[in-house]
């Protein structure tokens, strides 16, 4: 098993973790038919996508 030679510094740990931060959702769309807000390229909670009903309950 691999064992580290020296303890990584706080700086190296921070540099490794610098890309792990969560980002806010910035790409929201409003459906033409229902006016509901949803993620882009996803259907709404009502089952609409690009103005069409794609899922019926």
UniProtKB/Swiss-Prot annotation:
GO terms for biological process: translation. Signal peptide: none annotated. The keyword Ribonucleoprotein applies. It comes from the Bacteria. GO terms for cellular component: large ribosomal subunit. InterPro entries: Ribosomal_bL32, Ribosomal_bL32_bact, Ribosomal_zn-bd. Residues 1-26 are annotated as: Disordered. Keywords: Ribonucleoprotein, Ribosomal protein. SUPFAM superfamilies: Zn-binding ribosomal proteins. GO terms for molecular function: structural constituent of ribosome. Belongs to the bacterial ribosomal protein bL32 family. This is Large ribosomal subunit protein bL32. It comes from Cronobacter sakazakii (strain ATCC BAA-894) (Enterobacter sakazakii). The lineage of its organism: Bacteria, Pseudomonadati, Pseudomonadota, Gammaproteobacteria, Enterobacterales. The gene is rpmF.
């Amino acid at each position: 098993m691999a064992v580290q030679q020296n303890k990584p510094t706080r700086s190296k740990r921070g540099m490794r973790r610098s890309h792990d931060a969560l980002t806010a959702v910035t790409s929201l769309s409003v459906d033409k038919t229902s006016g509901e807000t949803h993620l882009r390229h996803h259907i709404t909670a009502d089952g609409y996508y690009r103005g069409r009903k794609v899922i019926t309950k």
